[in-house]
């Protein structure tokens, strides 16, 4: 979701990568939950998160080469996602607090979020490692 990947690219990947990727499992889980491609027909909100939630849920950040609040691209990607799709989510009461917080973000932070999204998608689409591009994501304070 954070990268705006075409949802059927994800289902195609699952079908190619896993012999047990049956439509009745992949379609609702990948399209409905993972990609929020069905809108609110199946789920009440997209399943995306920023760095604070990831840190709270486990020790994933301890082995990462990015600093959780200074260089990690996840939170800027999170905010860029909501900025890009805020109109679609405006009537969703479960996202009201997220959208209010988004409104409070400065224009500078929003510009940094958008640039991080562009940098990450470009880097990954070129088959490069984000860790090699670590300097692109500096000053990403959450």
Residue ranges of each PLM-predicted region?
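C-terminal catalytic domain of photolyase/cryptochrome flavoproteins
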Residues: 1-142
């Amino acid at each position: 979701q954070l990268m705006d990947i075409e949802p059927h690219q994800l289902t195609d990947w699952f079908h190619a990568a896993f012999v047990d990727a049956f439509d009745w499992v992949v379609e609702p889980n990948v399209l409905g939950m993972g990609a929020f491609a069905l809108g609110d027909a199946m789920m009440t909100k997209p399943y995306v998160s920023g760095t604070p939630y990831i840190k709270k849920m486990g020790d994933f950040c301890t082995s990462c080469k990015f600093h959780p609040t200074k260089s990690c691209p996840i939170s800027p990607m999170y905010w860029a996602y909501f900025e890009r799709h805020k109109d679609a989510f405006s009537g969703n009461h479960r996202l009201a607090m997220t959208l209010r917080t988004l409104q409070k973000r400065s224009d500078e932070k929003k510009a940094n979020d958008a640039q991080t999204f562009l940098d990450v998608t470009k880097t990954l689409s070129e088959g490069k490692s984000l860790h090699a591009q670590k300097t692109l994501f500096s000053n990403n304070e959450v």
